[in-house]
Amino acid sequence: LAAVDCSEYPKPACTLEYRPLCGSDSKTYGNKCNFCNAVVESNGTLTLSHFGKC
């Protein structure tokens, strides 16, 4: 099972680094920062499906 440590998020700004992750919502997030901010906004309901594009 893939996992990402989001303990240091949310962050006010994310870099444009492209390292895609696929969320449990079948949406591709550009990088860990974007994904983790979305996880925080979802109150933890969003999880990582896998690394790479959906």
Swiss-Prot record:
SMART domains: KAZAL
Annotated PROSITE patterns: KAZAL_1, KAZAL_2
Keyword terms: Disulfide bond, Glycoprotein, Protease inhibitor, Repeat, Secreted, Serine protease inhibitor
Annotated InterPro entries: Bifunctional_prot_inhibitor, Kazal_dom, Kazal_dom_sf, Prot_inh_Kazal-m
Site entry (Reactive bond 3), positions: L16, E17
SUPFAM superfamilies per UniProt: Kazal-type serine protease inhibitors
Cellular compartments per GO CC: extracellular region
Domain commentary: Avian ovomucoid consists of three homologous, tandem Kazal family inhibitory domains.
Protein known as: Ovomucoid
Source organism (scientific name): Alectoris chukar
Lineage of the species this protein comes from: Eukaryota, Metazoa, Chordata, Craniata, Vertebrata
